[in-house]
Curated annotation (Swiss-Prot):
UniProt organism field: Kluyveromyces lactis (strain ATCC 8585 / CBS 2359 / DSM 70799 / NBRC 1267 / NRRL Y-1140 / WM37) (Yeast)
Phylogenetic classification of the source organism: Eukaryota, Fungi, Dikarya, Ascomycota, Saccharomycotina
Residue ranges, compositional bias (Polar residues): 437-468
Residues in coiled coil: none
GO annotation (BP), single: protein localization to bud neck
Function: Required for selection of future bud sites. Cooperates with other bud site selection proteins to recognize a spatial landmark during mitosis and they subsequently become a landmark for downstream polarity establishment factors that coordinate budding and cytokinesis. Involved in the septin organization at the bud neck.
Similarity remark: Belongs to the BUD4 family.
Superkingdom to which the source organism belongs: Eukaryota
Descriptive protein name: Bud site selection protein 4
Keywords associated with the record: Cell cycle, Cell division
Bias kind Basic and acidic residues: ranges: 470-500
Length: 1217
């Protein structure tokens, strides 16, 4: 009975472990392999099992000694122990049958509730043993380990009340007899076993080998034999057996890595030169139930493009590379495959075309030296030199995951002559083109056309020989399997010709792109040079349109030395230059050739592209449709705006004068005396070239006779001495329009001029683009191309030959313009009396001169404002001022208007204080002002006269002498005349001052106030005549002779001049307003504020951005909120108004209704271009402060005129403008 009780006590534990194992397997919880348990725990369990066996053996021996009854008891204990041991290794079916057998006994306890002392869970995992039986790790642990917890039995009622109710229902399937034959139970067992098998399955399905075709990488240095054959590669997926074999050596580490969330390797391989056969990567969210899912190779790892043990082949020794060969090789092969050339991998988005099969090396085979050699870095200061080799299939090692790649054999021979190879390649290409005419539309024809251009550039003649180039056909297919469901096979076929490039010329220091040397020109002086007709050529266009089309001369534009020559099929003898023998020589663009004046082409409406500058490369030199359209537009504009075209031409082109001296008739007749060119033509108002003797010109010509840069030196020297705004001899602007050339009339006219000047040496010069002086004729005389025809108002047709209307050098016009062009022309005609055929003045030049004068005057309405402030009158020489009750006024006269100041009393003593201001509108820089002092007085009617009276003294004695006493007294008498009547004019004028305003004076008072003193002179005082004074006849009084003007007082005045710089500029009325404007400007500049504002608009659109704003005067600078770096500057001078609370914008100033809703709390800045920028502050108080400050700044904008800033700077910093 005791043994049965023990068996019943063990039954709940067995059922608990069984049900717990079923629940855990159904819910697919994570399991831990027994191999992952610590070795110490395993050893302890084995020791405990051995100890239990020893106890059982001892028990048996004791049972033999005690007797039958005790032996039976021992046997039961042994059976129980053996049963327990057997349960630990029994499969699930045996345990379940045992549990069903126990169902007959009454069940007192339905479940066991454990109170764990340690929270470490116990997870079971089923393993497949060698004999095929299922073993539970939990059963082994339960039988061998001592439990570290205490158990408390609970009844079935408590289990239903406090725990999940369906637990008992699940137990009933195993404990109740009515559910013993449940058909779902075998299905459940089968599902569990199937899940165990799939979880421990180690043989994943192997992928089929992948076959794909890639295009070979183009070599860095193209050689004459370049294969464009596609490469077909077959790749096998990594074998799982190799992975398992590699993991078998480290079984414990492999088992630990199965459920690890940490990557296998701590470093990340970025160069992909690492062998990945033994690596298994598990992501953080992946499951480890399936071993196939543990294979986490990346997409590109399946192809093993970078794995393998292939050796890096060495490149052949190639000839020097030039630019032309590189251009021709860039189009030799066209990739027709779209498999790997455009596809990118899923992981790193790296094109598969970037991998080079010839450089793929495994990790175990790549050494440090090999990695350095793979970079192919040449030695410094020299080109890489590669040995000759032969590329075949045996020269490449085969990796474990890649099939052998077959290449066409390419042989490189460095001993072959370069010139012979070039001819052979050209012959092969021409023969291929002739033999395959149907391939004209293929990309090869483009290559052939490119090679044809290369042949022309290299100067190789065309050779026609038939030679068929072999064709290689490549079949490529790509097969791969996606998740075992898709099989996609693509076949591509492409014809690829074997394209051979011409060998490159050797590179010695600086390689040449042409057969001929750029810095070595052949001597062409034998090509029909005539010194008497050598022409001054300024650009290529004039050469093309002026030379005669024929075989009598050689055009420099078609010369072998010209940059614009057509590509010649026969090249000149090539010359090789080394670094030591190189000597710099300026390139000769064109040499002197025969140039006949009579062969000039008359102008027509044909397509002629002429330039006004000295550009050697004219972008319109080609006769294309676009250039014709541009030329037609230029002609149309010239016809519509003839004078504007002339004006623009004068402004755009810098005039330059030839410093050339002309020698008369014969050299022997040249005068030895020095010629004063200023005295020769000074009466003609002509400006000549700087004096230069004929000997200097002739010697310079002989020194530079064999050089073609003589003209360039003269042109450069003339540019330095050139001036703008040149005039012709008759005082008008030079006309740069061209016309027909009458050489005979020109020569006749010049001869007549020289004859009238007594055959003195006359220096002739003009603009380099206007006058053509034949340098060759300077030996015998001079020859000038000049047109004597009158120029119409319309723009004449342009011609490659340009001229001016005078043979003399022009001179800058004088400051004082002539009153009438007719009078000026008449004076010039009188000077040139000997001329029978005087040149006429160009009507276009006259019109342009008048229009320029009108333009200067109409641009600004005046020259500014002149302000005068009268301060005081000092040292007034006038008596009895108080008796005459005198008053004064100042009369101001500017020649157009007369203004009088109010009448004021004259103080008897001291200076007269004044505060009167005048404004003068300066219509010119020379203005005369008159200020007159007038006095109004009252002549006295009576005059106090001193009288001496004798007053008798009373006698003492009656008969004494009478004595008198003298007494003086003043007696009022009638005034006969007044002294002031001889000092004033009839209108009361007493003194006058004349102020001559000129440029010097304006310069002293420009943008600043100066105190000036002007003397008043009395010009009306007459001589005193006593007779006339006695009679006092007024008519006779004014007939008296006047005295010489004398100084009677001085006037102190503050003067300022504000010149006008803009027609929209506004000036105040007086100096007081000027000072007030300057004060307001200073007040505006002193406004400062800073803080954070939210901005929307301007450079911030569609959002509110917080910025740190700094206000300095009229500049609002927005800084970054964090870094405080300036980002935007807002000019508040352009702000028209500010809209804040209670003030809204209407019309164009309001953008839309949405802005009103979203930015209703913001204040807005309205600019002159109707742009609105919204601002808002962090609080209403800060917002109100910003609005007040910005409003004051905007209101002061009206005081911001151009002159205010200059006046302010002058007062503050004493800057003179």
């Amino acid at each position: 009975m005791q043994m049965e009780d023990k068996g019943e006590a063990l039954n709940p534990d067995a059922m608990y472990s069984l049900l717990k194992e079923i629940d855990q397997e159904i819910s697919h919880t994570d399991n831990i392999s027994i191999d992952q348990l610590p070795e110490e725990d395993t050893l302890d369990n084995e020791k405990k099992i051995d100890a239990s066996e020893n106890v059982i053996e001892n028990t048996e021996e004791e049972a033999l000694q005690l007797g039958d009854e005790s032996a039976n008891t021992t046997t039961e204990i042994k059976e129980t122990s053996c049963t327990e041991d057997h349960d630990t290794v029994e499969n699930t079916e045996d345990v379940i049958s045992m549990a069903e057998g126990l169902d007959k006994a009454p069940l007192e306890t339905a479940w066991i509730k454990h109170n764990y002392q340690q929270t470490k869970p116990v997870v079971s995992k089923r393993l497949i043993s060698n004999d095929g039986s299922d073993t539970s790790v939990e059963d082994i642990n339960a039988s061998t380990r001592i439990p570290s917890y205490t158990s408390e039995e609970i009844t079935g009622l408590e289990l239903k009340d406090k725990m999940v109710t369906d637990v008992g229902e699940r137990l009933s399937h195993f404990l109740d007899q009515k559910y013993a034959e449940n058909p779902n139970l075998p299905a459940l067992k089968g599902m569990l076993s199937m899940a165990d098998e799939k979880a421990m399955e180690d043989d994943p399905k192997k992928d089929k080998p992948l076959v794909f075709t890639i295009e070979p990488t183009k070599p860095l240095f193209p050689s004459k034999e370049v294969s464009s054959t596609m490469i077909q590669v077959e790749i096998h997926t990594p074998d799982e057996d190799d992975v398992d074999g590699a993991a078998a050596d480290t079984k414990e580490a492999t088992n630990l890595l199965l459920d690890s969330k940490i990557p296998v390797t701590p470093n990340v391989c970025i160069n992909r030169f690492v062998n990945n056969n033994g690596e298994t990567r598990v992501s953080s969210g992946s499951s480890t139930e399936d071993a196939q899912e543990l294979n986490t190779h990346r997409f590109q790892d399946r192809y093993h493009l970078l794995s393998g043990a292939q050796a890096v082949p060495q490149l052949p020794q190639l000839p020097a590379l030039t630019l032309q060969d590189y251009k021709s090789s860039s189009v030799q092969s066209v990739n027709a495959s779209r498999i790997f050339s455009v596809a990118t991998t899923n992981d790193n988005y790296q094109s598969a075309k970037e991998y080079d099969l010839s450089s793929t090396v495994g990790c175990e085979e790549l050494s440090d030296d090999a990695s350095v050699k793979d970079l192919e870095i040449p030695e410094p200061n020299e080109l890489p030199c590669f040995p000759t080799f032969q590329l075949d299939s045996t020269s490449m090692k085969t990796s474990s995951s890649m099939e052998t790649v077959q290449h066409d054999k390419a042989k490189f021979n460095s001993d072959v002559n370069i010139a012979d190879d070039t001819m052979e390649q050209i012959e092969q290409e021409e023969a291929e083109l002739i033999s395959n005419p149907e391939r004209s539309g293929s990309p090869t024809n483009d290559n052939m056309s490119q090679h044809s251009q290369n042949r022309q550039l290299l100067g190789v003649s065309e050779v026609s020989q038939a030679q068929q180039a072999p064709e290689h056909h490549v079949e490529m297919s790509v097969e791969f399997q996606d998740e075992g469901r898709r099989d996609i096979t693509s076949s591509f076929s492409r014809e690829s010709d074997r394209i051979e490039l011409p060998p490159l010329p050797p590179m010695n220091g600086l390689s040449t792109m042409f057969d001929q040397d750029l810095f070595n020109d052949h001597e062409t002086s034998h090509e029909s040079i005539d010194l008497t007709s050598s022409s001054h050529k300024e650009n290529y266009l004039s050469i093309w349109h002026s030379q005669k089309t024929g075989g009598s001369f050689i055009s420099p534009a078609l010369s072998t030395n010209s940059q614009f020559s057509t590509q010649s099929r026969t090249s000149s003898v090539p010359t090789n230059h080394s670094g030591s023998s190189f000597k710099f020589k300026s390139r000769i663009i064109s040499n002197s050739h025969v140039f006949k004046q009579e062969a000039f082409r008359q102008f027509s409406d044909e397509y002629v592209l002429s330039t006004q500058d000295d550009s050697k490369l004219d972008p319109l030199r080609r006769n294309t449709i676009m250039s014709k359209r541009i030329q037609q537009e230029l002609k149309t504009q010239a016809k519509m705006y003839p004078f504007a075209n002339k004006f623009a031409l004068d402004e755009s082109s810098e005039p330059s004068i030839h410093n050339e001296s002309i020698i008369t008739g014969d050299i022997s007749r040249t005068s030895d005396k020095a010629v004063d060119t200023t005295n020769i033509l000074s009466h003609k108002n002509l400006t000549l070239l700087p004096p230069q003797s004929t000997e200097t010109v002739f010697s310079s010509f002989l020194d530079n006779f064999d050089k073609d840069d003589f003209e360039e030196k003269l042109a450069e020297e003339s540019r330095l001495n050139s001036k703008k705004n040149l005039q012709t001899t008759w005082g008008h602007f030079r006309d740069v329009s061209s016309g027909n050339v009458d050489i005979k009339a020109t020569q006749q006219q010049i001869a007549e001029v020289l004859h009238n000047q007594n055959e003195d040496v006359v220096q002739v010069g003009s603009h380099i683009q206007d006058v053509k002086v034949l340098l060759g004729n300077e030996i015998e005389g001079y020859d000038v191309q000049k047109s004597v025809s009158d120029l119409s108002v319309e723009t004449t047709k342009k011609s490659p030959i340009k001229h001016v209307g005078s043979p003399f050098k022009v001179k800058a016009r004088s400051e004082t313009p002539p009153q009438s062009p007719v009078v000026y022309e008449r004076d010039t005609t009188e000077v040139n009396e000997g001329l029978q055929r005087a040149p006429t003045t160009s009507l276009a030049s006259v019109y342009l001169e008048n229009s320029l004068q009108e333009f200067e005057s109409s641009e600004l309405q005046d020259h500014g404002k002149l302000y005068l402030k009268l301060k005081s009158i000092n040292s007034l020489r006038l008596q009895q001022i108080k008796r005459h009750n005198a008053k004064y006024c100042i009369e101001f006269d500017n020649g157009k208007e007369v203004i009088e100041t109010p009448w004021e009393s004259i103080p008897e003593d001291g200076p007269i204080k004044m505060s009167q201001e005048f404004e003068v509108n300066m219509e010119s820089n020379n203005v005369t002002l008159f200020m007159t002092m007038k006095i109004r007085y009252t002549s006295p009617q009576n005059q106090l006269t001193e009288v001496v009276e004798k007053i008798p003294i009373k006698k003492r004695f009656a008969f004494g002498k009478t004595k008198y006493r003298l007494e003086k007294r003043f007696v009022t008498k009638k005034l006969k005349y007044d002294d002031w009547d001889f000092k004033f004019a009839k209108d009361g004028s007493f003194a006058r001052c004349q102020v001559n305003v000129n440029k010097n004076m304006l310069k002293q008072i420009k943008y600043k106030t100066n105190e000036l003193h002007f003397e008043f002179l009395n010009e009306w005082e007459r001589e005193f005549d006593e007779k006339i004074a006695q009679t006092y006849k007024e008519d006779e009084l004014w007939k008296l002779p006047r005295k010489n003007p004398s100084k009677v007082c001085s006037l102190t005045v503050d003067v300022m001049y504000l010149p006008r710089t803009s027609s929209m500029e506004r000036f105040p009325k007086n100096l007081k307003a000027v000072q007030k404007c300057c004060e307001k400007y200073l007040e505006q500049q002193r406004v400062n504020n800073e803080g954070f504002l939210w901005q929307e608009g301007g450079d911030v659109e569609g959002m509110l951005k917080r910025r740190y704003m700094i206000l300095k005067g009229t500049e609002l600078i927005a800084h970054d909120e964090v870094t405080r770096k300036p980002q935007t500057l807002l000019n508040l001078l352009n702000v028209v108004d500010i809209y804040s609370d209670g003030k809204t914008a209407t019309g164009k100033q309001m953008r839309n209704f949405t802005d009103m809703v979203l930015f209703s709390d913001c204040f807005k800045l309205l600019f002159a271009n109707d742009e609105v920028i919204n601002f808002n502050a962090d609080s209403n108080l800060l917002k109100q402060q910003w609005v007040e400050i910005l409003t004051s700044v905007v209101e002061l904008n009206k005081f911001h005129q151009p002159w205010i800033k200059r006046v302010f700077e002058n007062e503050q910093y004493n800057i003179t403008f």
